[in-house]
Structures are given as structure tokens and as C-alpha cells.
């Protein structure tokens, strides 16, 4: 019985502390115009930081000249 309680606590702990998947809405930024990346490509413009501390990169196509 005690082993089951410990196993349940361990599973719940892992579920609570597991980060969400990196796909979907989490990799968008700048009002869904930007892309979260570790480092912006040279052709893109750095806009700020994403929730996961990656750089928010705007394609030069989305910016006004």
C-alpha cells in the first residue's frame, strides 16, 4: 500500500513539473507574426523574447519598410 502511494506521488510530481510541448501556439510570438527560435537568422529581425526565453524573430516579410 505504501509503495503505491509513493509511486502515485512520484507520477503526480513529474506531471506537474513537466514542461508543455514546444509545438503549437508556444512557438509563436509578436501577435502570431513571429517565430520563437534559439537565435534569429540574419534575414530576420529580433523582436523580443518568448516565454521559453528563446528569441522572437520576425521575418523581414512581416515588417514595413
Curated annotation (Swiss-Prot):
<keyword id="KW-1015">Disulfide bond</keyword>
<protein>
    <recommendedName>
        <fullName>Defensin-B2</fullName>
    </recommendedName>
</protein>
<dbReference type="InterPro" id="IPR050544">
    <property type="entry name" value="Beta-defensin"/>
</dbReference>
<feature type="signal peptide">
    <location>
        <begin position="1"/>
        <end position="23"/>
    </location>
</feature>
<dbReference type="GO" id="GO:0005576">
    <property type="term" value="C:extracellular region"/>
</dbReference>
<keyword id="KW-0929">Antimicrobial</keyword>
<keyword id="KW-0044">Antibiotic</keyword>
<dbReference type="InterPro" id="IPR025933">
    <property type="entry name" value="Beta_defensin_dom"/>
</dbReference>
<keyword id="KW-0964">Secreted</keyword>
<feature type="disulfide bond">
    <location>
        <begin position="40"/>
        <end position="57"/>
    </location>
</feature>
<dbReference type="GO" id="GO:0045087">
    <property type="term" value="P:innate immune response"/>
</dbReference>
<comment type="function">
    <text>Has antimicrobial activity.</text>
</comment>
<feature type="disulfide bond">
    <location>
        <begin position="29"/>
        <end position="56"/>
    </location>
</feature>
<keyword id="KW-0211">Defensin</keyword>
<comment type="similarity">
    <text>Belongs to the beta-defensin family.</text>
</comment>
<feature type="disulfide bond">
    <location>
        <begin position="36"/>
        <end position="50"/>
    </location>
</feature>
<dbReference type="Pfam" id="PF13841">
    <property type="entry name" value="Defensin_beta_2"/>
</dbReference>
<dbReference type="GO" id="GO:0042742">
    <property type="term" value="P:defense response to bacterium"/>
</dbReference>
<keyword id="KW-0732">Signal</keyword>
Amino acid at each position: 500500500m505504501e509503495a503505491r502511494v509513493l509511486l502515485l506521488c512520484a507520477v503526480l510530481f513529474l506531471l506537474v513539473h513537466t514542461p508543455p510541448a514546444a509545438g503549437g501556439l508556444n512557438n509563436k510570438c509578436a501577435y502570431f507574426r513571429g517565430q520563437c527560435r534559439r537565435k534569429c537568422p540574419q534575414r530576420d529581425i529580433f523582436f523580443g523574447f518568448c516565454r521559453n526565453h528563446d528569441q522572437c524573430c520576425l521575418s523581414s516579410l512581416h515588417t514595413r519598410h
